[in-house]
Amino acid sequence: MNSNAIFPYGQDPVSESFRFDLAFFSCRGIDQDGIYETSFSQANFKKEMMQRAKQKILLVDDSKFDSTHFFKIGNFEDYDAVVTNQMPHSNYLNLFETKDVELLYPE
């Protein structure tokens, strides 16, 4: 996704009709308190799409851990699983387990 893309905000009849069985989401960063985005329009668009998905998967590489940004888009319990490229620090392992979020990474 182009990080400079502009997404509609507000009552959009087209996006309101979307429903997803499974949706994958990216983010700009995560920390112990949640998931973040840098753009107001992207943050609101992702929040709206999250409400329309039955299952939500967060895709986050190791460079995004311990990185906060302007707009919080959710909490870990909002997602069914987190997919990353390597095993995160133990404090995140404990957090995902506590929040009942499946963690997937290559061994």
Where are the regions that the model predicts?
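Conserved phosphate- and dinucleotide-binding cores of soluble alpha/beta proteins
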Residues: 1-107
